[in-house]
Amino acid sequence: GSSQFSAIGAVDSPVIRDSYTDKPMIPGSSFKGKMRTLLAKQYFRTAMLQEHNADPEIVLRLFGSSNKNAIRPSRLLFSDMFLLNEQELKAVGIDSVTEVKFENSINRLTAIANPRQIERTIRGSKFGLDIIYNVEEEKEIEEDFKAIKEGMLLLEYDYIGGHGSRGYGKIKINGLKVETAIGDIDSKVIDSCNKILKEV
């Protein structure tokens, strides 16, 4: 969620919404950024993460680099994710696709309370995920997809957005399918990539 202002009685941290439908959405940048960070942690040989232009080669290959001496475009393009199953949720008696959770932190020294309201999407919400993979080296496709699979599995164990240590932002990724959008790729390679992503 975001917290640009906090009026009396208002939600302190509202969810991000699609300005066209006013429904919750997940920015592609949030998904991409978290997946990149988790993969960098996984592949780094040091205890501390470095700045993103120093990421391991496989991560730079997939997510790009802005290093002025070695600019690399991202092979992965992430679209924003929009709510898919609002009608399905309403059919089981759910009136709103978001809920507001009231939380309260208390200062240990002063005992002063700090109540706040955090909006979140309800459990069972489904969002559409579209990722474009740009082929640069055909021999690297399967290796790249193994890293993509690993990043998605890491995301399922982690979270997207804020307050993850309190259970927010848990996701499950399923129904992944690889298709050729432009150009010709060997069908055996496509089948192999689909097999890899079935492990998510």
Spans of model-derived segments:
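RNA-binding basic/glycine-rich loop and surface signature characteristic of RAMP-family CRISPR effectors
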Residues: G1-I106, T110, N114-V200
